[in-house]
Amino acid sequence: DTKILRFSYSSMTTPREIYDYDMDTRMRILRKRQEIPSGHDASRYVTRRIFARSHDGEDIPVSLLYAKDTPLDGSAPLLLQGYGAYGHAGPASFSAHRFSLVDRGFVYAIAHIRGGTDKGWRWYENGKLEHKPNTFADFISAARHLCQEKFTREGRIVALGGSAGGMLMGAVANQAPELFAGIIADVPFVDVLNTMLDEQLPLTPPEWVEWGNPGADEKAFKTILSYSPYDNVRAQKYPAILVEAGLTEPRVTYWEPAKWVARLRELMSGGGPIILYTNMDAGHGGAAGRFDALKDIARE
């Protein structure tokens, strides 16, 4: 038995802090605070939570970070990040890397779309299997709402997502390319239908609970076909897209991003460029070394 509860806290403007809370005296004691070697003045920044209305009336939480002197008249560039899969909730926590962009006038936004558990288990259930298209609609709705509220404007948004979030990037590139100046897709799962049909791939059967089994279920086949990024590339103008792959990647094999890039380059009617970067020594998580990982972030 103990009367002390230890917890941690951070926000998009506050580095991680660890506290002890005495449940008898109701006193809170700061035990440790994350040090930022380059320095950090939280008073220079604003973090907010707003909500965007999706196609079916659901309110999509969007977390924002920007400098206090950023003009909110639609002129600011905006980086919009999303994932929306496997029940993973995207925490609006502190990351020192973001401030390089924010200090240069960017608004940084995280769309807490369906497929995660940001609003509970129902939020996850309504973004998987036959409900997967909600994930993409939510992200597009968040982007449009940010334009309507003058945090940015169409053509000033860069979208960012990796793995299943890379699938999100591919889907929104097909469905609403006019919204984005650029898209960054890290190890993107973009050939969804072919991968889910190939049960010889060791990671395919465990994934059927998330996406459906198109080889055994016609409804799952049609749903996946409706959004699979590779299968829905068409002759239209695309934003600039940076695609990153890893040669030793066991989850999203390197040829998936490569064939997607080839299809985009073949069919697109304008826009781009479409750039493929393959790390010859990296897997699903990107570069392993601390400094190499920082180079990955800087490249993006």
For each feature predicted by the language model, list its residue ranges.
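Short hydrophobic segments within beta-strands
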Residues: 8, 65, 81-82, 160, ...
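Flexible loop residues that form catalytic
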Residues: 10, 23, 84, 162, ...
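Conserved hydrophobic/aromatic pocket- or pore-lining residues that grip, position, or stack substrates
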Residues: 18, 52, 62, 80, ...
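Short substrate-entry loop that stabilizes the transition state in hydrolases
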Residues: 70-120, 192, 253-254
